[in-house]
Regions:
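Conserved C-terminal alpha-helix-loop-beta "cap" of PLP-dependent enzymes
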Residues: 40-133
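Active-site C-terminal subdomain of aminotransferase-like
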Residues: 1-67
Length: 134
């Protein structure tokens, strides 16, 4: 283990962090359910597709919104920045400004209340911009 300093330090670091990782994944089913809730809200917006496996088994999700938010961005005065701007007004940050085509989000560590807020915010933005909700 300590023959190569670079590899040894990496292994020791991983061993030291393992208890923290174990603690973080104790509620993995809840984390996946949270991801599924936001994914379902996004899928209720006509033209939105999930590019990750579905139903969700992970908290990181890749979505394609070229058929929904990107169509709004083409006509909107803020172009692709409208989505991040609208979400920021609602207290949601982290979406890369200008991203309305294909992007990722991660729901890990959010509370149920925060998950509901995020899902409702996406649907609200879609509704305000004339997108159909299925």
């Amino acid at each position: 283990m300590m023959g190569c300093t670079l590899m040894g330090v990496t292994v020791v670091g991983m061993m030291a962090s393992f208890p923290h990782v174990q603690e973080r994944v104790k509620n993995w089913e809840d984390e996946v359910a949270h991801s599924q809730a936001v994914t379902d809200a996004l899928l209720s917006i006509e033209g939105t597709k999930v590019l990750s496996d579905y139903p969700r088994r992970h908290s990181l999700t890749r979505v394609d919104t070229r058929g929904s938010f990107d169509t709004v961005a083409q006509e909107h005065k803020k172009r692709g920045y409208f989505l991040s701007s609208e979400l920021k007004k609602r207290g949601i940050t982290g979406i890369i400004p200008g991203s309305t085509r294909v992007w990722k989000y991660n729901t890990f560590g959010l509370t149920t209340k925060q998950i509901q807020h995020v899902g409702e915010a996406f649907v609200e933005v879609a509704r305000e911009n004339g997108l159909n909700i299925i």
